[in-house]
Curated annotation (Swiss-Prot):
The modification Phosphoserine is found at S524, S663. Interacts with Wdr82. Residues 138-327 are annotated as: Highly charged. Residues 9-30, 644-668 have a biased composition (Acidic residues). Belongs to the suppressor of sable family. It is found in: Nucleus; Chromosome. It comes from Drosophila melanogaster (Fruit fly). Residues 1-36, 74-326, 499-535, 588-622, 639-695, 710-745, 780-835, 979-1058, 1143-1170, 1295-1325 are annotated as: Disordered. This is Protein suppressor of sable. Residues 149-179, 276-296, 444-478 form a coiled coil. It comes from the Eukaryota. Residues 236-246, 1149-1170, 1295-1309 have a biased composition (Gly residues). Residues 149-158 have a biased composition (Basic residues). The modification Phosphothreonine is found at T604, T664. The lineage of its organism: Eukaryota, Metazoa, Ecdysozoa, Arthropoda, Hexapoda.
Length: 1325
């Protein structure tokens, strides 16, 4: 055993590498065979040199390798460190011997194993322990030693080995099971592995699968028998001769040159290093997939990792375009739904189609909404396989995958895909290799159905011809060989088994597959259909369609109106188009159509095969079966012959018409020579106009109204359209005309002159006549034509034979006396029709009027025409504009084709929403007595007005809910409950009292006789109850209400909660309270909490106990008095909250009239103020006096008297002043705490005219009465009896509090707590 050591430190690969692992992760550069001895270089600690061991013989069992750091370049055995002296496990020895054998075999072949380089000393590189021979390695450097502890490294490796052994044992059973089904079940195994994201490299260049062995040997020795060139260009990219065709990114990276007989275990370990643990566990299964690839011929090319999108040639064929001849399709020709959601974890390794799946929109000829960002393939023409994949996807994919794409039928998709395919082939100069769409793309089931349909069509045509010949012979025998008359035809119904197919999906496919221009109901003589003219392309309808609508239609593959015909109405609406949009498209498109287009364009209308329903002889029952489709040929309308909605004309809807009585029609036969029978069934020539479809109803109406009206003005009565009216007589086969004798004395005289006059009538007049006949098929008397679902939608003037009154002139009942006006083109017919001649086809039914009444109704309709334009239709017609692409059920005729719709016009009107806030704001500025409507007061949240009709016109004693009328402005944010104040509202008249009633001045106290004693119940006069209330409820509650209103001393069961709620509601609607700052509101609530507590205690006392509410705490608390003054309330000795009405006269403001603006009581023009009396606990004999509200003492205007009153002692029975904790305030007596100079004007804000108010303006503590401007609240009067001034916490002292740091106003001194800069919110109002 020859061993050579390098100069660099040696790594003990026994410790760093696991059992026979080969690490080739970082083999970015292929080692050349010239590098047999590595150069002596000093690198970092991570750059290492490896010891290669070569066996002298091929006996692998004798080779036991010890690898470690060495200091001697000659003797390897002496250089082994202590860490490697222990015998290696058997697995390591076996792996090393196998690698040695591989290296020796390669050397004998002339191939030098490459020398892989290591990234670091900590990474496992078991491959490189066997690379190179002993003579190919340089001597080791004795100075550099491995720094890692061998014991620690050994323990770590042992733990890793144990873990890997456990995992291998768990996976060994799986590998054994997979080995059993390698050959027969290779495809299934491969699918499973691809689902696990397991991907391997390309097969070796041998191309043949090696024999499988239990030891996991991958390749035989013969696989490596190649020269340098073949190895370099092999599919595996193995660089022979050390030249390096191999790199770490090779598609066959799981193998190296020297592992010809290497077990699969090594590859599993390498895969663990390269990928993840899951791929490592599936290493053996990857070998099976590579073997199968080798059997299939393998991949050739650059040797990169095999991609599932690789083509058959060129290795990296993932970029090859779609549809290539060498394209290898994925096994799963289905779209990956996870890729669609952008969450496929397998990515390129997924077995389903990702990016290569063809885009539905692109290959159907639509505009892909995603554009360049589309997830699917755009580009070259599809192969037939991918075409079928896309067709299957559109048919079977669930709604979740299709998304917004509207599912279309297979046949429509084939047509669109073929058109797109031809365009792509032309653009790219490719050959169109697709099979015929009509035959090759149809399945066996479709082919069978097509054959059956063709056979049925031929059978029907033969039967039709026979029946026509019979009818012609019979007509010739009955009519003496004359030309058959219009009403002489006998028509057999079509075969019952030939009902129309599904109107939504399969009908167009059957027609396209048949290769005929018409449907299965069309004559064989009909030529191929012509597409719509190019001016009806959607690209030319930009004035009709918006960009959004155009995108919607392009999304469905619709580029012109012909394609829109093929799309069902429901699908158009699902695509986002509204009924208005669809109708507007068609209406404007037909308006834009040239007038001569209808005359020049001609195609064959599909004629109905009609048979007699009951009896071939119409003489027996007087009934005939008439084809109605020919009627519409007179309307100058030309349409495509391949109408996709022809199945709507295929129904067995034959109109049974009573032909009057049995008589001959010889006199009608001569006029018929000059005019074609409109109702006759023809094998029409190509010059006749085709039939309109349901889709083209508006064109019929527009031509009748627009083009027809111009034609009526330009053409004489005898002028007709020769291309459409008379061409079918010389061009058609006269033997196909069917006729039956019809008796005709008086019945046919008028009818013949109407229908077949000596001169041909104007086409529009005739079309109007036909339209009215067609309108109601259930009215058998109403005409001689059947009704199709696509033949009636006109608004022109007509002679209706049905009594269906509508506002429209074109849908009105007959007006016989107006015939001369309606039909100026019929000079022969008009005299023949007396004004009162009834219709000869009248047959009584439940829908019809009496003929006499019908005549009278026609006369009345002339007078009421304009009025009826705004009324609803009377015979259940649609009340809207006709929908242009409407497909109603044709089993009945109760739709727009038998009931002409009314034209409605929608006018958009903007109505301002009701703003109750503005109403409330406007109510604030009105005289509040004007708003007496209780409904408006409830809407605005105002209390209902009390009954002010007491004796002497005085204000009665108000109960707890007796809010003043003048308090409307303070109740603007809540809606009053109807049962909240029952005591007063039940006694309030429902109608508003006269507005002239004026409340008395508060300066006049109410008479004492109105005040009852405390414990004496006073009966109130009976008043009217609110009529809006339930009378039964009023009766039940009357005794209770009377008792509760009479007994004012009854205790409140809720314990004063009603009084508390009243005070709170007054707070919420008070502008003064709402404009206060947060701190001031807290202070007000704290003061009112004292009142609430006393009210609760008082009202919880027994009812029979004599009780008088103690108001002494209110009298002694000036802050409470000021709060009550601001709220205009006081609490009487019964514990009830009474509101003080404001002063109604205008010479001065009411109580605190200037209070909201910072002024004091008596603001404005110096109005009087109010000083509350001292309502401390009185002696018992004064209890009755204390029930009175506080007297309203009007203040004198003389400033001297005001000064005198302001400087006197305690006024009106107030207790003497008491000092607070800090003593008496500096500039005032006990009452004027914190009040500044009282003598000057302008001290109280806006109270300029009246002078100062005594007592320091006790009712406006928040108004700023210390020399500040209006709205200043710099110094609040003392709170309670503490004698402590209250500073404004929100605004700065002086200067209105608008700016920080304002100069001291009066005694404010600017010492406020909240010196908030820029506080422009003036809360002192």
């Amino acid at each position: 055993m020859s061993v050579a050591l390098a100069d660099e430190p040696l790594i003990d690969l026994e410790e760093d590498l696991e059992d026979g692992e080969i690490d080739d992760d970082e083999e970015d550069e292929q080692q050349s065979s010239k590098i047999q001895v590595q150069k002596k270089t000093f690198v970092g600690d991570d750059d290492v040199q490896f010891v290669g061991v070569e066996a002298k013989n091929q006996n692998d069992d004798e080779d036991v390798v010890y690898v470690g750091p060495s200091t001697d370049a000659v003797c390897l055995q002496n250089s082994n460190s202590t860490k490697s002296k222990k015998p290696r496990p058997l697995e390591d020895d076996h792996a090393s011997s196998i690698e040695l054998a591989i290296a020796n075999a390669l050397k004998k072949k002339g191939i030098e194993p490459p020398m892989p380089r290591m990234r670091s000393s900590n990474q496992d590189t078991s491959d490189q322990s066997l690379e190179g021979s002993g003579e190919g390695l340089a001597t080791a450097n004795p100075l550099l030693q491995s720094t890692r502890s061998s014991r620690r490294r050994k323990r770590k490796k042992e733990r890793e080995r144990e873990q890997k052994k456990d995992k291998e044992q768990q996976n060994r059973s799986r590998r054994d099971e997979n080995d059993v089904s390698v050959v027969p079940g290779g495809v299934e195994d491969m699918d499973e592995y691809e689902m696990m994201n397991v991907r391997g490299g390309s097969p070796p260049p041998g191309g043949a699968a090696p024999p499988l062995s239990s030891c996991g040997q991958r390749f035989s020795g013969a696989d490596w028998d190649m020269d340098d060139g073949s190895a370099a260009t092999g599919a595996a990219g193995l660089g022979a001769g050390g030249g390096g065709g191999y790199n770490s990114h090779s598609s066959y990276d799981s193998y190296s040159d020297e592992e010809t007989n290497g077990p699969g275990l090594m590859n599993q370990r390498r895969r663990t290093r390269r990928d993840n643990e899951k791929e490592h566990q599936r290493g053996v299964n990857n070998r099976k997939r590579r073997d199968r690839d080798r059997l299939e011929g393998g991949l050739a090319g650059s040797g990169s990792k095999r991609n599932r999108r690789d083509s058959g040639e060129g290795g990296g064929g993932g970029q090859e375009k779609m549809g290539g001849s060498n394209r290898v399709e994925p096994r799963k020709l289905e779209l990956c739904k996870f890729y669609l959601m952008d969450c496929c974890a397998k990515r390129d390794k997924c077995s389903y189609m990702h990016k290569e799946f063809p885009c539905k929109y692109y290959y159907l000829g639509m505009d892909c909404y995603a554009g360049d960002d589309c997830l699917f393939y755009h580009g070259e023409p599809l192969s037939e396989q991918l075409r079928n994949v896309l067709l299957k996807h559109m048919e079977t994919a669930p709604k979740e995958i299709l998304g917004d794409f509207k599912r279309i039928s297979r046949d429509i998709a084939i047509v669109q895909m073929t058109r797109r395919h031809e365009q792509l082939c032309d653009q790219l100069n490719r050959e169109n290799t697709w099979n015929s769409i009509g035959c090759g793309l149809m399945g066996k089931r479709q082919d069978h159905q097509m054959q059956q349909q063709q056979q049925q069509l031929q059978h029907q045509q033969l039967q039709q011809q026979q029946e026509q010949q019979q009818t012609q012979q019979q007509a010739a025998a009955d009519g003496g060989g004359c030309i058959p008359s219009l009403l002489d035809m006998v028509i057999n119904p079509p075969l019952s088994e030939n009902k129309r197919k599904s109107r939504w999906t399969e009908k167009m496919g059957a027609k396209a597959a048949a290769g005929a221009a018409g449907s299965s109901e069309r004559d064989s003589t009909s030529p191929d259909a012509k597409p719509l003219p190019p001016h009806l392309d959607l690209a030319n309808l930009s004035h009709v369609l918006s960009a959004e609508n155009m995108a919607k239609l392009n999304k469905l593959g619709i580029t012109n109106l012909e394609q829109m015909l093929q799309v069902p109405f429901g699908q158009l609406t699902e695509a986002g188009l509204t009924l208005v949009e669809i109708g507007e498209i068609q209406r404007k498109a037909e308006d834009a159509k040239p007038q001569t287009q209808a005359e020049l364009e001609s195609s064959t209308p599909p004629s109905k095969r009609e048979t007699e329903a009951n009896n071939s002889n119409s003489k027996s029952n007087g009934l005939i079966m008439v084809d109605y489709t020919q009627y519409l040929k007179d309307a100058h309308v030309s349409f495509s012959g391949n109408d996709p909605l022809d199945d709507d004309r295929d129904d067995d809807e034959q109109l049974i018409i009573d032909d009057g009585n049995d008589s001959t029609a010889e006199e009608d036969q001569q006029p018929k020579k000059a005019k074609a029978p409109p109702a006759a069934t023809h094998e029409s020539s190509t010059e006749e106009a085709p039939l309109p479809s349901v889709f083209d109803l508006p064109s019929f109406m527009n031509n009748m109204l627009g083009q027809g009206s111009s034609a009526r003005q330009l053409l004489p009565a005898s002028a007709t359209s020769p291309n459409q009216e008379n061409a079918h007589l010389p061009g058609g086969d006269q033997s196909t005309h069917k006729s039956a004798p019809i008796g005709g004395g008086t019945s046919t005289n008028v009818l013949g002159r109407i229908l077949f006059g000596d001169k041909q009538s104007d086409p529009e007049a005739r079309a109007a006549f036909y339209r009215d006949i067609i309108r109601n098929p259930f009215k058998a008397h109403s005409g001689d034509g059947d009704v199709d679902s696509s033949n009636e939608n006109s608004n022109s003037n007509s002679h209706s034979l049905t009594p269906t009154p509508t506002p429209e002139p074109g849908s009105q009942s007959p007006k016989p006396e107006d015939h001369d006006q309606d039909m100026p083109e019929l000079p022969v017919i008009a005299p023949a029709l007396p004004p009162t001649t009834p219709s000869l086809y009248v047959r009584r039914s439940m829908y019809d009027f009496d003929p006499v009444k019908e005549q009278e109704h026609g006369r009345q309709e002339l007078l009421t025409e304009e009025k009826e334009q705004y009324q609803r239709d009377t015979d259940m017609r649609l009340p809207f504009e006709p929908m242009k692409h409407y497909m109603p059920a044709t089993e009945i005729d109760a739709a727009i084709f038998s009931h002409t719709p009314i034209r409605w016009q929608l006018h958009e009107v903007t109505i301002e929403e009701s703003s109750y806030a503005q109403i409330r704001a406007s109510a604030l500025h009105k005289e509040q007595r004007e708003l007496r409507d209780p409904r408006m007061r409830r809407i605005l949240g105002l209390p209902e007005t009390p009954d002010n009709s007491g004796p002497l016109g005085s204000v009665p004693i108000m109960g707890p809910s007796s809010f003043s009328v003048d308090n409307i402005a303070r109740c603007a944010t809540t809606i009053a409950s109807p049962d909240l104040e029952t005591a007063v509202r039940d006694s309030t008249p429902s109608s508003p009292p006269p507005s002239v009633v004026n409340l008395p001045s508060m300066s006049v106290p109410p008479p004492s006789m109105r005040v009852p004693p405390p414990n004496i119940q006073v009966e109130k006069p009976t008043v009217r109850t609110d009529p809006r209330r339930d009378p039964r409820r009023a009766v039940l509650q009357a005794p209770t209400k009377g008792a509760s209103t009479a007994n004012t001393t009854a205790p409140n069961a809720s314990g004063g909660s009603k009084q508390i709620s009243e005070i709170r509601s007054l707070l919420q609607v008070s502008n003064w309270y709402n404009n206060l700052g947060t701190n001031n509101k807290i202070m007000v609530n704290q003061q009112l909490a004292l009142v609430f507590t006393e009210l609760k205690k008082f009202h919880q006392l027994p009812n029979d106990a004599p009780k008088i509410f103690d108001v002494s705490f209110i009298v002694n608390n000036t802050t409470l008095q000021q709060i009550f003054a601001k709220l205009f309330i006081f609490v009487d000795d019964n514990g009830e909250v009474v509101q003080i009405p404001e002063e109604p006269n205008g010479n001065g403001a009411a109580l605190g009239g200037g209070g909201d603006s910072g002024g004091g009581v008596g603001g404005g023009g110096g109005g009087g103020g109010v000083v509350l009396p001292n309502l401390s606990q009185p002696p018992p004999n004064l209890s009755q006096m204390l029930r009175l509200p506080p007297p309203n003492i009007r203040m004198l205007r003389m400033s001297g008297m005001m000064m005198q009153m302001g400087n006197v002692g305690p006024p009106f029975n107030q207790p003497p002043p008491r000092g607070g904790l800090m003593g008496m305030p500096p500039n005032g007596n006990g009452l004027n705490q914190g009040v500044g100079n009282l003598g000057g004007l302008g001290q109280l804000g806006i109270n300029q005219g009246g002078g100062p108010v005594p007592n320091g303006n006790p009712f406006n503590p928040f108004g700023g009465n210390n020399g500040g401007g209006a709205g200043v609240m710099n110094n609040m009067n003392s709170m309670g009896n503490m004698g402590m001034g209250f500073n404004n916490f929100n605004n700065n002292g002086g200067r209105g509090g608008h700016f920080p740091g304002g100069g001291s106003g009066g005694n404010g001194n600017g010492n406020n707590r909240n010196q908030r800069g820029g506080n422009h919110r003036n809360r002192n109002i």
